[in-house]
């Protein structure tokens, strides 16, 4: 994602973190919101199914509830989907799958790394 376009996206979105570890994403543009949410919330339902988080849509906000790691992954996926929608004018199922796959794989790789206390040279 280009840095300039990311700045534009983050200006269009507002992130609100709650004490119960949920994240609310507020959209300022209803057209973008409807594109990201999808017809009959289909994109959010797919994202919810793939991520294992609970995703709610109300007004101009998307609310993500789950554990903190999954919430952040879904938040980044929604930012990615917003970028895709603004660039292409539409979203496909592959965009939804790839948005989460990219971030889930990164998180999985972070979890699999172990820190080394010693390095032995031979």
Whereabouts are the PLM-identified features?
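Short amphipathic alpha-helix segments
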Residues: 32-49
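Conserved short hydrophobic interaction patches
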Residues: 43, 50, 80-84
